[in-house]
Amino acid sequence: MALSMHTNYASLVTQNTLNSTSGLLNTAMERLSTGFRVNSASDDAAGLQIANRLEAQTRGMSVAMRNAQDGISMMQTAEGAMEEMTNITYRMNDLATQSLNGSNSDKDRAAMDAEFKQLSAELNNIMGNTSFGGQKLLAAGGGFEAGAVTFQIGASSAETLDVDASASIKKVAATLADAAITDGIGDATKAKAALDKISDAGGLIEDIGATRAQFGANINRLEHTMTNLGNMVENTSAAKGRIMDADFAVESSNMTKNQMLMQAGTTVLSKTNQLPSMAMSLLR
């Protein structure tokens, strides 16, 4: 290597190496301080684009999980109301059956009739006032009575679940409004008509049971949907993490290595900067 006063090649090489090492040290320290391997598009342009797409998918699926849970809660509210209606209907069936027994006096039948009518009124009360989040569910024009309720259960617009229990709910409401129910069980004729309307095929007990079965089937489906969404969120998040997250073991090693190289480079630079003075010594 020539000994020159004007160009200190060794110093230039050392400076360039120091600049490169400084950049690597800064990158390692930035990754350690933020916890991310990719802090700007320049770190990994393709990786950042993929990670952004995975993040959007993950967020969409997380919202879909909440939607599914809300759907389950909404249907559980309606099904719970129907469960109580079933219990009430069983009691009404018992009263109608008991009223037909010849051992009852007129006062006995009147007492049974009064209870029967109160229970019938409570059935209508449940139908009219069961609500979720301020929305009536079983009343005329209510959520499930009006038609299909659509739940968004995926990250794309095509991933939906339509729950349509309107026909069976309307049938229950029509049965409750039937004279066989509203007239009570004050005499044997009325009691027989009520008993038939409650317990026969296509009667109130069967209609309520069919409605509950619809809700139950869709609740079970949504629970499986949530499990699958949770699995997808877990794996999509892991994939995004492999792209975006810093490996602390690797970055700590890089930081230590580059700190040592910076120290060594600084020492070497001070030595190379002394080379031009060596040329002056030749003139003494």
From Swiss-Prot:
Annotated protein name in UniProt: Lateral flagellin
Similarity comment: family membership: Belongs to the bacterial flagellin family.
Species the sequence originates in: Vibrio parahaemolyticus serotype O3:K6 (strain RIMD 2210633)
KW Secreted (keyword) present: yes
Upper lineage: Bacteria, Pseudomonadati, Pseudomonadota, Gammaproteobacteria, Vibrionales
Domain of life of the organism encoding this protein: Bacteria
Additional information: V.parahaemolyticus possesses two flagellar systems: a single polar flagellum propels the bacterium in liquid (swimming), while multiple lateral (peritrichous) flagella move the bacterium over surfaces (swarming). The polar flagellum is synthesized constitutively but lateral flagella are produced only under conditions in which the polar flagellum is not functional. The peritrichous flagella are unsheathed and powered by the proton motive force.
GO terms under cellular component: bacterial-type flagellum; extracellular region
Primary role: Flagellin is the subunit protein which polymerizes to form the filaments of bacterial flagella. Essential for lateral flagellar synthesis and swarming motility.
Gene3D superfamilies, sorted: 3.30.70.2120, f41 fragment of flagellin, N-terminal domain, Flagellar export chaperone, C-terminal domain
Principal localisation: secreted
Record gene name: lafA
Gene Ontology MF term list: structural molecule activity
Compartmental location: Secreted; Bacterial flagellum
Subunit structure: Homomer.
Pfam family, one: Flagellin_N
Alphabetic keyword roster: Bacterial flagellum, Secreted
